[in-house]
């Protein structure tokens, strides 16, 4: 999976940070220490960590992910990260 989206709401400095959806790579989620949760009323699961986004971004940088874009939507901040694939067609 070459792309990852992470997001946080309201408090950038403290977390929690949403790091993946139910289809995310389990090995990356394990590396981040994420837990899979389903919020009451939602019909999908998400992976969350208690760490702030900066620490998550640092961890993803160590395994080769780079920020492609970042945006704010209301009180939510979202980062899109990409990892170059070693498979070339």
From Swiss-Prot:
Q: Which residues cross the membrane?
A: none
User: A Gene Ontology biological process annotation?
Assistant: negative regulation of biosynthetic process
Q: Which InterPro entries match?
A: GFRP_sf, GTP_CycHdrlase_I_reg
Corresponding gene? Answer: gchfr
Q: Name one GO cellular component term.
A: cytosol
* Protein name stated in the entry: GTP cyclohydrolase 1 feedback regulatory protein
Tell where it localizes. Answer: Nucleus; Nucleus membrane; Cytoplasm, Cytosol
Q: Which UniProt keywords apply?
A: Cytoplasm, Membrane, Nucleus
Q: Which organism is it from?
A: Danio rerio (Zebrafish)
């Amino acid at each position: 999976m070459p792309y990852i989206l992470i997001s946080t709401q309201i408090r950038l400095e403290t977390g929690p940070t949403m790091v993946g959806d139910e289809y995310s790579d389990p090995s990356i989620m394990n590396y981040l220490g994420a837990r899979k949760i389903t919020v009451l009323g939602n019909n999908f699961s998400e992976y969350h960590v208690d760490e702030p986004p900066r620490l998550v971004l640092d961890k993803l940088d160590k395994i080769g992910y780079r920020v492609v874009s970042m945006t704010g939507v209301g009180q939510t901040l979202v980062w899109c990260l990409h990892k170059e694939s070693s498979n070339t067609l």
